[in-house]
């Protein structure tokens, strides 16, 4: 029965993207159900299908995201982490992975030196001497070397663990096509059940967040975090080129989706979106 229900759900999702507007098709479907003598039995059956679909989708989403995250953390702590730390610490002369780390380390050391001289000028450090200053600078330099060596080894560990998690995620998707089909049908039902105002609100929220006026600042922070997470150089030119092109491409794809699909599925939602966006 579950396979038959899945086929029925997928067929209903396909019907919603047909030539006839969804509002008219829903009206005819409502009349058809009201005249059907088996309407009560079908209503109970649809409730069972919806309940099974919801439970299966929630379980699949939890499994789909929790397993890769757990594997990522476990592999970093017990597999890649100790191995990379051992190899990286064997050569004490290798500290930085890229020039961005060097620039940040030198900037921190320079700020520490300026702070040290400021404390000497205001009398916070009693009887300052060149030996004391050299000792404190050496101590700070060693501290920075340890911190950035750990950051470099963690970046390599992150790359390996992330690749493993992505491989696990893709393998789960490939090996669970039926569960993915159920999830897709559930999301379609969830989206189509929203009111036109809710759809328009979500569209505006999505566009303003990712392609709106203030989105470049958010993209800049996200790209810097990703580059630092993977140990890649934080090139300002690359970041500026990305935030000046990717949101534009995303906005073009989104507008094409509205024109090509959403305008056929729910024209009233598109009209509400334009009214709210004005």
Curated annotation (Swiss-Prot):
<keyword id="KW-0633">Potassium transport</keyword>
<comment type="similarity">
    <text>Belongs to the CemA family.</text>
</comment>
<keyword id="KW-0406">Ion transport</keyword>
<protein>
    <recommendedName>
        <fullName>Potassium/proton antiporter CemA</fullName>
    </recommendedName>
</protein>
<dbReference type="Pfam" id="PF03040">
    <property type="entry name" value="CemA"/>
</dbReference>
<comment type="function">
    <text>Contributes to K(+)/H(+) antiport activity by supporting proton efflux to control proton extrusion and homeostasis in chloroplasts in a light-dependent manner to modulate photosynthesis. Prevents excessive induction of non-photochemical quenching (NPQ) under continuous-light conditions. Indirectly promotes efficient inorganic carbon uptake into chloroplasts.</text>
</comment>
<keyword id="KW-0630">Potassium</keyword>
<dbReference type="InterPro" id="IPR004282">
    <property type="entry name" value="CemA"/>
</dbReference>
<feature type="transmembrane region" description="Helical">
    <location>
        <begin position="154"/>
        <end position="174"/>
    </location>
</feature>
<dbReference type="GO" id="GO:0006813">
    <property type="term" value="P:potassium ion transport"/>
</dbReference>
<dbReference type="GO" id="GO:0009706">
    <property type="term" value="C:chloroplast inner membrane"/>
</dbReference>
<keyword id="KW-0050">Antiport</keyword>
<keyword id="KW-0812">Transmembrane</keyword>
<feature type="transmembrane region" description="Helical">
    <location>
        <begin position="203"/>
        <end position="223"/>
    </location>
</feature>
<keyword id="KW-0375">Hydrogen ion transport</keyword>
<keyword id="KW-1133">Transmembrane helix</keyword>
<feature type="transmembrane region" description="Helical">
    <location>
        <begin position="238"/>
        <end position="258"/>
    </location>
</feature>
<dbReference type="GO" id="GO:0015297">
    <property type="term" value="F:antiporter activity"/>
</dbReference>
<keyword id="KW-0472">Membrane</keyword>
<keyword id="KW-1001">Plastid inner membrane</keyword>
<dbReference type="GO" id="GO:0015078">
    <property type="term" value="F:proton transmembrane transporter activity"/>
</dbReference>
<keyword id="KW-0813">Transport</keyword>
<keyword id="KW-0934">Plastid</keyword>
<keyword id="KW-0150">Chloroplast</keyword>
<feature type="transmembrane region" description="Helical">
    <location>
        <begin position="61"/>
        <end position="81"/>
    </location>
</feature>
């Amino acid at each position: 029965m579950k396979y038959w229900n899945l086929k029925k759900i997928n067929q209903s999702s396909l019907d919603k993207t047909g030539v006839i507007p969804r509002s008219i098709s829903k009206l005819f479907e409502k009349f058809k159900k009201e005249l059907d003598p088996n309407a009560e039995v079908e209503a109970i059956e649809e409730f069972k299908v919806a309940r099974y679909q919801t439970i299966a989708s929630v379980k699949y989403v939890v499994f789909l995201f929790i397993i890769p995250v757990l594997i990522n953390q476990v592999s970093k702590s017990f597999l890649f982490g100790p191995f990379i730390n051992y190899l990286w610490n064997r050569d004490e002369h290798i500290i930085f992975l890229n020039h961005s780390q060097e620039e940040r380390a030198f900037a921190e050391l320079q700020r520490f030196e300026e702070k040290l001289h400021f404390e000497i000028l205001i009398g916070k450090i009693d009887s300052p001497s060149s030996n004391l200053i050299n000792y404190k600078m050496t101590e700070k330099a060693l501290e920075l070397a340890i911190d950035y060596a750990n950051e470099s080894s963690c970046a390599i560990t992150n790359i390996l663990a992330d690749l493993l998690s992505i491989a696990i995620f893709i393998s789960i998707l490939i090996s669970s096509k039926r569960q993915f089909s159920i999830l897709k049908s559930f999301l379609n039902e969830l989206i189509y059940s929203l009111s036109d105002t809710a759809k328009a609100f979500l569209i505006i929220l999505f566009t303003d967040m990712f392609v709106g006026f203030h989105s470049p600042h958010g993209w800049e922070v996200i790209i810097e975090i990703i580059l630092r997470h993977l140990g890649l150089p934080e090139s300002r030119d690359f970041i500026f080129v990305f935030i000046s092109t990717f949101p534009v491409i995303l906005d073009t794809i989104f507008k094409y989706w509205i024109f090509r699909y959403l305008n056929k599925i729910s024209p009233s939602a598109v009209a509400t979106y334009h009214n709210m966006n004005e």
